[in-house]
A protein has these predicted regions:
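Long, low-complexity C-terminal extensions of enzymes
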Residues: 65, 77-153
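A structural signal for short, well-ordered beta-strand segments
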Residues: 1, 45-47
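Short, small-residue-biased leader/transition segments that mark boundaries at the very start
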Residues: 3-8
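Flexible, glycine-/basic-rich loop-and-beta segments that form/coincide
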Residues: 52-64, 70
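Short acidic alpha-helical/loop segments enriched in Asp/Glu that coordinate divalent cations
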Residues: 9, 56-61, 84-91
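Short loop/turn segments at secondary-structure transitions that flank enzyme active sites
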Residues: 49-51, 79
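Long, charge-rich alpha-helical interaction segments
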Residues: 9-39, 44, 66, 75, ...
Length: 153
């Protein structure tokens, strides 16, 4: 449901000039995130960041220092992502490649493709732009892999 809401919001932003997300949108997204289906869940704690933080130049202007601290935290989060077959399939499907084909089976690929099509079928809006919505779903599923690769290479 959360993916559908995000896709619909992206379409609204694209199609309606000046569209702004409302407080109600945030509440619905939080509710969906808390109570919705989770699929596979991976929880991991990264090593202590103190050594990395000690390396930062404390004389930087605060906005720059905070940006570097945020980047450090993001890097640790992204490097600890658990990447699943669906993330690899989404990346290859979105980009028209087979770059990560060794990371999933044909059965896993078909399961994920069916899942995406089922999610699209649940979206009930007039003049549904399935290509646009599919792209948004694939972006959501491929982004963890993109972030992981950017942080850990």
């Amino acid at each position: 449901r959360r993916q559908r809401q995000m896709c619909i919001r992206d379409r609204l932003k694209r199609d309606i000039e000046g569209y702004k997300k409302t407080t109600q949108d945030d509440l619905i997204n939080m509710q969906t995130g808390l109570f919705g289906y989770k699929g596979r869940v991976h929880f991991q704690v990264a090593p202590c960041l103190n050594d990395d933080l000690k390396e930062l130049d404390r004389s930087l202007p605060k906005p720059d220092l905070f940006a570097r601290i945020s980047a450090c935290i993001d890097r640790h989060i992204h490097c600890n992502y658990q990447i699943y077959p669906g993330n690899y399939v989404a990346y290859d499907w979105l980009n028209g490649t087979t770059e990560f084909v060794s990371n999933y089976t044909e059965e896993e690929k078909q399961q994920f493709m069916n899942y995406i099509e089922q999610q699209l079928a649940k979206i009930k809006i007039p003049n549904k732009d399935e290509d646009f919505l599919r792209e948004k779903l694939l972006l959501m599923y491929s982004n963890p892999l993109v972030n992981y690769l950017a942080a850990c290479r």
